[in-house]
Structures are given as C-alpha cells and as structure tokens.
C-alpha cells in the first residue's frame, strides 16, 4: 500500500507540470455554440472605416471587403471616393491593382500591401478575426456575452493584440449572430482602428 501511494505521489508533480503547459482557452457551451455559428459563415461583405497610426504615417480610409472561400477582395478608398488600393487574395496568392492601373502580384498579401503602401496590416488573418473567430490565435479571452474580448498572435516574431470593443447583431440563416462593429489591432507602436458599419452574410 505504501509503495502504491508513493508511486502516485511521485507522478503528481509531473501531471501538474503537464497541465500547466496546456493553453487556457475558454470552452463554455455558449462560446462553442457561437463559434459554430461563425464557422458556418462562408461568405461575407463588410463596409466600414479604417484608421491607421504609426510613427511614419497616419491614414483614414474607407474599406469594402467581399470575402468567399475562393476569393477575397479588399478595396480601400479615400474620403473623396478615390481608390487607394484594390487587393485580391486567392489560395494561389495576392494581386493588387493600384490607382494608376498597375497590377502587382505576390505570394503574401500582407507583404504586398506593406511594400506598396507602407501599411502593416495582417490582411491574411483578418478574414477570420474581423468576424470574431480566433483561428490561429496564440491566446484569446471572452467577454460576458461569450464573444471575443481580445486575442493575441505572433506574426513574423511580432506580437499582435486585437481588442473587440463593440458588437452588432446581424441576421444569418434566420437567426441573429453578434459580429464585431469596433475592433483595434496593436503591434508595438502601430495601431489600427476598424469600424464596420454594415455586414452582409451568406
């Protein structure tokens, strides 16, 4: 009996160390239900505004985002309605049409946008994050309504922090789904404020 007890006491610290290494992600029934609804969204259209602040530049742009599994189109315009950037993303890569009718392609959409505009925007991850899905996140937290409050992700050795400050109820398949209306992305001294004024889901 003594040997058996001693054996389990020896294993206990190892078990506790193993447990502390597991990611502490929320797993409430309400969150799982909400996450399942979000995962059913195959296509969306989002219209809104983006504010970009960094030591090098400040930009205020309108955006129109049409996303589907096969193709995602993100267009930025100025307040005068002029197209600043027209980005198309597919599984094969990214393509940009500039205001002077140039067409540039690259395998990485984020790098292409930065190359052309100087703006650091994780556009490839945003298709999930903008609807409130923490896919690929290193960590995330929920609010009292069991929707995303924040998430964190390391991209190219840089830590991104995304905070969700406001949600809006949107109709989807004869039910109501809360989707982000305001969120902010921060990476060191870079900050993006995104306001979604209109959602259309399919």
UniProtKB/Swiss-Prot annotation:
Superkingdom of this protein's organism: Bacteria
Q: Where in or outside the cell is it found?
A: Cell outer membrane
Write the signal peptide boundaries.
Answer: 1-18
Q: What is its main location?
A: membrane
Which residues are covalently lipidated (S-diacylglycerol cysteine)? 19
Keyword set, alphabetical order? Cell outer membrane, Chaperone, Lipoprotein, Membrane, Palmitate, Protein transport, Signal, Transport
Name a single GO cellular component. cell outer membrane
General function of this protein: Plays a critical role in the incorporation of lipoproteins in the outer membrane after they are released by the LolA protein.
Q: Which family does it belong to?
A: Belongs to the LolB family.
Q: Tell me the NCBIfam families matching this sequence.
A: lolB
Q: What is this protein called?
A: Outer-membrane lipoprotein LolB
Q: Which organism is it from?
A: Vibrio vulnificus (strain CMCP6)
* Gene field: lolB
């Amino acid at each position: 009996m003594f040997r058996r007890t001693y054996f389990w006491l020896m294993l206990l610290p190892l078990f506790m160390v193993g447990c502390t290494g597991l990611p502490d992600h929320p797993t409430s029934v309400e969150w799982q239900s909400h996450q399942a609804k979000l995962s059913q969204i195959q296509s969306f259209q989002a219209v809104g505004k983006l504010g970009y602040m960094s030591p090098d530049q400040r930009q205020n742009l309108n955006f129109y985002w049409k996303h589907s599994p096969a193709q995602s189109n993100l267009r930025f315009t100025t307040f005068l309605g002029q197209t600043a950037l027209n980005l198309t993303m597919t599984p094969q890569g990214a393509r940009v049409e500039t205001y002077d009718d140039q067409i540039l392609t690259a395998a990485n959409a984020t790098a292409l946008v930065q190359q052309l505009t100087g703006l650091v925007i994780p556009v490839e991850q945003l298709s999930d994050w903008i609807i409130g899905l923490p896919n690929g996140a290193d960590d995330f937290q929920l609010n009292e309504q069991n929707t995303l409050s924040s998430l964190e992700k390391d991209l190219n050795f840089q830590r991104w922090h995304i905070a969700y400050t406001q949600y809006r109820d949107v109709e989807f398949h004869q039910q109501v789904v809360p989707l982000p209306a305001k969120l902010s992305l921060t990476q060191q001294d870079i900050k993006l404020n995104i306001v979604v004024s209109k959602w259309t889901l399919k």
